[in-house]
């Protein structure tokens, strides 16, 4: 984007207050990202935010977000946010553009089919039961940490199902939490801050290097091994072929897709589960309704994938926590001049939107800040504006693993509530922490056997 084009865009788009020299709004975003992204709606439908010296134009309404993600999706590529994540996830689905994205999506989509998720559900159930079995009556469990471990364990077991994959499983357990902790700030901050000799940078760089190195070795070893009779993601990716060209994925492409699944899947599931339990203990009426539903649908046996579509109360709770605690910020870049609402943006313009802010907009949702799962009852769901709820994105960039997350989270909620009653441990009120999605700092709870 030329200086002249940038000036024309700047002349018609309101700039958010609070920018400082060199850093722009990066410091404000770092200090309180959730408050900042929610404040932008009050400044217009499109608001300019400066990340360092880079202007970013933030769309704040469901209609404009739909323009970016669906109606004019082919006029956008992944933007700076994803450029900054490329050292972690390479050119996996989250980062790929154009024909590369379409090719990889065709090849990866079958791995999240209904039949595959049925297979993965056995791992989800087994890990949920192991988690519930590990708790002792009267002990305090950090639910945020427990759900993070469950989500990472399930992803790792789904990706690497043999002894050969154990080094990768251990690398995921050790390094993924370190990377997720600093993901948003790293992606949104000016690149020169990466070089500051501070512990956060050292830990991040070390974890990224270790994780990529171990997964590279496991992928190469699996390729040499040549076995194709397993159903883990690694084996499926190695065997995948493009239906048009007949070409498979290179080892680097396999590594990139595995990394993408890790970053996209672990934090979303863990956050949704932790917030679900947190919200339910404050609403015993809803918890009792869910427990009654579990007893009616599941009984005292194991929760299976056949039960998932019938556990409708759990689905409404998960919908509501994903609305309240969703994706913090996503970015795109225009590839051609784009008309976005009343604003003409030239090619090369960085554009962003916050699902977290959009899903909490009081102009869109009645009692937007309140936890109200019944807003997702069929008779009330119609009142939600079209395109206003997209927890997994929309259009050709919608997350292909959404059914994986719904299934995994439903099985976990039902398994835990079937066995345990949770109550808040005194002395701590959970606080929101902005990362790729909004998770809690800690949610300590006392667990007691359910009568």
Task: Please name every model-derived segment.
Residues 1-103, 118-130, 166, 202, ...:
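N-terminal membrane-proximal hinge/A-helix region immediately C-terminal to the signal-anchor transmembrane segment
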Residues 23-44, 213, 301-341, 362:
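Conserved cytochrome P450 K-helix E-x-x-R motif and the immediately C-terminal K′/meander segment
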Residues 2-14, 77-84, 96, 100-102, ...:
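Cytochrome P450 heme-thiolate monooxygenase catalytic core
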Residues 12-19, 121, 125, 173, ...:
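Cytochrome P450 I-helix active-site segment
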Residues 2-6, 10, 128, 174-177, ...:
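Cytochrome P450 proximal C-terminal region
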Residues 268-287, 291-293, 403-419:
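Cytochrome P450 catalytic-core helices
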Residues 353-380:
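Conserved cytochrome P450 K-helix/beta-meander segment immediately N-terminal to the heme-binding cysteine loop
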